[in-house]
Amino acid sequence: MELAYLHTRPEQYARLKAECADFIVKENLGYEMSGDGEFVAVKVRKTDCNTLFVGEKLAQFVGISERNMGYAGLKDRKAVTEQWFCLHMPGQPTPDFRSFQLEGVDILEVTRHHRKIRTGSLEGNHFEILLRGAKETDELNVRLNNIKQCGFPNYFTEQRFGRDGHNLTQALRWAQGEINVKDRKKRSFYLSAARSEVFNLVVSERIALQLAQQVLRGDMLQLQGSHSWFQADEKEDLNALQARLEQQDILLTAPLIGEQNPPATDIENQLVEQHQALLTLMAKERMKAARRPMLMQAQALQWAFVAEGLKLAFYLPAGSYATALVREVVNVQED
């Protein structure tokens, strides 16, 4: 099933990641390294490299176990990305990385930090993207301005579901009792894929019904800039909430299913209830129900048309996908 577009299906086609340099990601942890402590912090720029592979090579270089290496998040492989790694080396001098050699990897900075960089401990990412072959038209400029003003669907995209949707397929088989999954990492990937699928379906349905920017009775609303949310129950004034939504003081959310999912809108409740096997699996695995904004606003969105195509620059908070924004701009041509 194709997910709905907030700004209608794009007219143009373009190539994404034709070259690594067409997709640049710069991590923002949201804090500075302390300069001292038990951890060696290494900032790298990697090109066409897997995050985990680079982390393993750094750990090998300094002679520690991969378990004592950390990073905030996995970055795209076919891209140029900058991110921090940390290496637990208490009581040891800071290594000299000038002799570290790995194709596609440059060491940008080495310092110390007082605690481990943990998965998920980042504020967001800066993106610079070239969409090759996109042409300047009135329609595309209007589309970009609409995305800047109204945002884009906060969908989970392909990387969340694995190659050819493998993680989702396995999650569904697991939920139906066809397979048993013992590997901890695989369990995590499959559960995340299942939750992401239900989230996407709820958001897509709201967009298809032209209700993705309207507060409904039962909606779960998130306060801007926080993870706190409240329900648009009978005590709440829907008109007042709609005004707050339009001022971007609050955000509409969709479910990340878990155990004890709170009732929401009729639309959401009906869609969630269609996935009983997944709900049972989530309860069995003690996954905590959560919420995620339906729409996302790209911060500092800028664009320029160049000879090769369309250049985009923007910032997204952690957990949102640049490819979800790109999907609203152009149809991506497969190489």
Curated annotation (Swiss-Prot):
InterPro entries (alphabetical): PsdUridine_synth_cat_dom_sf, PsdUridine_synth_TruD, PsdUridine_synth_TruD_CS, PsdUridine_synth_TruD_insert, TruD_catalytic, TruD_insert_sf, TruD_pseudoU_synthase
Known EC number: 5.4.99.27
SUPFAM superfamilies named among the record's database cross-references: Pseudouridine synthase (SSF55120)
Gene3D superfamilies: TruD, catalytic domain (3.30.2350.20), TruD, insertion domain (3.30.2340.10)
UniProt KW keywords: Isomerase, tRNA processing
Catalytic site: D76 (nucleophile)
Protein name (database record): tRNA pseudouridine synthase D
